[in-house]
Amino acid sequence: CIVETVTPELGVEYAKNLGISTLTSTDLNPATALGGITDGVSNLELTSAFAAIANGGVYTEPIFFTQILDHDGKVLLDNQPETHRALKDSTAFLLTDAMAESVQTVSSFARPGATINSTSTRARLSNMSVAGKSGTTTSNNDIWFVGFTPYYTAGIWGGCDNNQSLSSNGGTSFHKDIWRKIMERVHEGLSDPGFAVPDSIETAQICRKSGKLAVEGVCDHDPRGNAVYTEYFAKGTVPTEVCDKHVVVTVCAASGMKPTEYCPEKRSKVCMSIPQDAEGSTDDSAFGIPGYCNIHTDLSTIFTQ
């Protein structure tokens, strides 16, 4: 569990720095990483925490008015919110990029032609970049969606006063529909600038099978298609190792298997490196290094083709 590496103490410190005020000493445990906190969290504080991510890591105290004027226009109260940096701008952007995927439909690399709906596609806006995260409590007693665009952040909570479980038959998705319909109205007439990439971020070409630097001409020739994608990194954290999952082997041009001494023509083929002691199978298993050619097994097979 990553929270054990980070430590619950540091995780709680970050949450408090993002404006979560309900945390107690009993929340210094790994369950807090999943939202299992003793006194829960208000929609206002959770939405404000997400707004800090949307704001490049700068937290702004939520306020409900900026000024109160008298009948002559004199300022009686000037309400300026407290702000402070809660996250590095690179961290905020990487979180934004990750949460943007939760509202997208993505192609399945393992099964070409198939698509995968992420958890919050119902919150996707027609002409605006969106990032966000949905969540539920035990037995669907509470449902959440908090998301943001380059302009605004909004949070929707759904539940019952008596804490009863919501129906799984559509009862756990309506909050995303509410969020989408409100935000569609709010963003009418606004152009989509996308999420700004800070100078503290750099990109690299990564192999999706190894998570390491892609090898040109190899990782992009995976039997299932191009396994290379562009990933964002905080500067100085780009991987230095290159992919070790894709290998180029010489095979018989006819059988596609490792050549024997009798194979008349050979070609190169990209395969997956499967550990010799691997048990079971994965999506990569069908694309491992093949056995020896079963067509050209002796000298006579050369002259019968």
Predicted regions and their residues:
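A penicillin-recognizing enzyme superfamily signal
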Residues: G40-K245
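Amphipathic repeat-derived elements
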Residues: T5, Y59, I63, S191, ...
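A short, terminal or domain-edge coil/loop segment
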Residues: L18, D78-R85, S173, D177, ...
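Active-site-adjacent helix/loop patches that line small-molecule binding or acyl-intermediate pockets
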Residues: C1-I20, D27-N55, A98-E101
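Low-complexity, Gly/Ser/Thr/Pro-rich intrinsically disordered linker/tail segments
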Residues: Q205-Q305
